Amino acid sequence: MRFYTGQHRHYCGIDLHAHTMYVCILDSAGEIVLERNLATTPEAFLEAIAPYRGDLVVACECLFTWYWLADLCAKEQIPFVLGHAPT
């Protein structure tokens, strides 16, 4: 298993569902700077992360809904990490 070791100013974790997503962004000190439930749309996501885009990495769990988010991050040049929950 490979672990992500990149260092960033902000870290975004997403609990992604079909219609909603819970977004939490931490700064490099581990303090929460954003915690919000959003509609699962590119527009809502990009608006929420806009203030933190300078140095942000996005991560979500490998579920059936992750493809669009990975594609959006690639298009927007946002580092993206796909996590696998241990069994």
Question: Where do the model's predicted regions map?
Answer:
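Phosphate- and other anionic-substrate recognition elements at nucleic-acid/protein interfaces
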Residues: M1-T87
